[in-house]
Amino acid sequence: MVELSEKVSGLIYQLRIFMPMEPGYVFSYIVKRDNECVMIDAGYPNAELLNPLINELSKISNCRLSTLFITHMHIDHTGLANELRNRLSLSIVMHRRDYEQVLKMLDRDLFIKEFLELLGQYGVPNAEMELYRNVTSGLSSRRRLSALNPDVLINNEEEYIERMHVLLTPGHSPGHISIILDEYKLAFTGDLILPTITTHVGLTPINPGNPLRDYLNSLIRIRKVDLKCLYPGHEGEICNVNDRINELIMHRVSRLCEVVNTLRNNELTIFEITNMLKWMDDKKYVDLDPMNKYMALTETAALVKYLESIGIVKAGNDYKYGIIREIMCDIRELIPQ
């Protein structure tokens, strides 16, 4: 259920923590310098995992654990934060932008209301509304099961805390952070960059604005840091850092072009575009389970928002989008370099 392994001798330890949803586990990390330790992320909210997690932590010798960094607000990264603080007297650190969204989710009725209003703009038919009401209600309920009350809120795009270089890298969430060990050229990137999975970037009430633009800028920001390896929240370490970042950028270019091609001869709502794209395992929207329908719809919304922001598409009064500037779907037309 919880497994400890040493990733970089005497410096980085990884905790593999079970969770009951894909991909089945999440990583937390311990960074040890001298006898001082900090923890990065707090696993899934399952009280039965708390004692096994603490037992695994005790296997790291001469490790005075003082601080818990939260890379982002999602419950598989915040789950046991309060319990760990209570048992180990930790200080919890996260970015203010994410904490503000945590507070928003705790008001379930308001959260559902805002999302249903957004669905109207996405062109979702009434027949689908109950499905999305249930999904958003479930997200809010799970959030309340894992209440989070940080001790330190990061306010800036870049800070140094406990000798850790913290960068704001939004997109997956508004206040997602990456944590860099400058002297080793190593970083902990939460869900920003994963080895084979493409991170969900969706436009929702708790990830507002232009999240795909934020995500692409975050990838480019990390690419400029010159890192040897990344330690993400799932799958495994990444040591072909820039190659993987370039793959992820090209994946988004491909998806943006799919949206553009879908709109070449039609004006469509975001819901209609979502139905015309292929999703996980090459499935159509209609074949997805409710949670993956939510992810597909909100990802399409983020793609369309990005295209709108660079002047390629525009919506009419009926929320149907059409092309207003033709492009060849070249990366230089779509992505800031």
Residue ranges and their predicted role:
Residues V2-K59, S178-P195:
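Conserved beta-strand hairpin/beta-sheet module of binuclear metal-dependent hydrolase folds
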Residues L11, V31, D41, H72, ...:
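Divalent metal-coordination and catalytic microenvironments
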Residues M21-P23, I154, P170-S173, Q337:
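A short catalytic or substrate-binding loop motif that flags glycine-/basic-rich loops and adjacent residues
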Residues C37, Y44-N46, S140-R142, H165-L256:
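Metallo-beta-lactamase
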Residues E48-L49, E56-Y160, T274:
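Active-site HxH/HxHxD metal-binding segment of metal-dependent hydrolases
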Residues P52, M73, H77, N242-R264:
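Active-site/pore-lining binding-face segments in mid-to-C-terminal subdomains
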Residues T78, Y215, T300:
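Aromatic/hydrophobic pocket-lining residues that form the small-molecule binding cavity
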Residues N261-Q337:
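C-terminal regulatory/interaction regions
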